[in-house]
């Protein structure tokens, strides 16, 4: 990484730290938005909206069991409550999340693409062209997929505790291989989806030519001109090294202080930086 770029990234985090002020967080339960369904062919996506302003698509964490409930469960902060005062927040249950209400085909040959279909299809359904996006966990690879497929529609992207590939994930017993339990869960909920089909889906998604952020190459990240903000993590499924590599490679990337979740007093700093980033890049 260019020494000047490393210094700029460090300076950005330092400025955010210096200007941070305490905030009230939505760690406690909050009122949910109004839920609706978006349907396209055999796909049925449950989504909710809250607030008004420039559209902000919020992708919940939770791996393949990502649902809107993530935001009122035990996240670092409740992004819906935090941003609905300035943005039209839109979020949805992931297709075929066992605990969610979204359903659709298990597309073995195009797993990542099928999720991008849902995310962009929901924006189309709502009549939204340009939007910003913030994703937790598996939302990181989803965002890179969206940036590759529809770069002109995304004004800015925030990747919080993003998923990334590490060689240890080849070990079936590794804690970071979060997708291993999904086939049994989804086939139990939907008997028409065989466990074999579900296993083929996750193998294609996470184990076939797996590398980096799963959905794009390093060469793509090097030329991506969309503004991004990375909030790294360091747990088995969220490798710090991959998150930082994205921040170093992407020409218009910023990065938060790390660690930003511990001690808890640092979370307001991270949220303040997200607010500043979104305001800086949303269209006037």
Where are these regions (language model features)?
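Short beta-strand/loop motif that positions the catalytic acidic residue
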Residues: 224, 230-231
């Amino acid at each position: 990484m260019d020494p000047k770029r490393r210094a700029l990234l460090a300076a950005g985090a330092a400025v955010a730290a210096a200007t941070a002020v305490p905030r009230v967080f939505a760690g406690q339960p909050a009122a949910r938005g109004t839920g609706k369904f978006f349907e396209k062919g055999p796909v049925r996506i449950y989504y909710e909206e809250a607030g008004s302003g420039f559209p902000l698509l919020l992708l919940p964490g939770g791996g393949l069991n990502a649902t809107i409930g993530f935001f009122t469960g035990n996240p670092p902060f409740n992004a819906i409550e935090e941003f609905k005062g300035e943005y039209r927040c839109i979020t949805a249950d992931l297709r075929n999340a066992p605990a969610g209400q979204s359903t659709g085909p298990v597309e073995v040959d195009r797993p990542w693409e099928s999720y991008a279909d849902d995310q962009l299809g929901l924006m189309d359904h709502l009549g939204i062209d340009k939007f910003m996006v913030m994703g937790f966990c598996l939302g990181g690879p989803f965002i890179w997929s969206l940036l590759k497929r529809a770069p002109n529609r995304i004004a800015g992207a925030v990747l919080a505790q993003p998923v990334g590939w590490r060689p240890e994930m080849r070990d079936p017993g590794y804690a970071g291989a979060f997708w291993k339990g999904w086939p049994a869960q989804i086939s139990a909920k939907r008997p028409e989806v065989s466990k074999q089909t579900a296993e083929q889906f996750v193998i294609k998604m996470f184990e076939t030519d797996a590398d980096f952020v799963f959905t794009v190459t390093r060469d793509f990240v090097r030329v991506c001109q969309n503004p991004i903000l990375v909030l790294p993590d360091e747990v088995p499924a969220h490798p710090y090294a991959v998150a930082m590599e994205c921040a170093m490679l992407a020409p218009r990337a910023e990065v938060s202080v790390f660690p930003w979740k511990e001690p808890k007093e640092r979370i307001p700093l991270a949220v303040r930086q997200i607010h500043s980033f979104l305001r800086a890049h949303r269209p006037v």
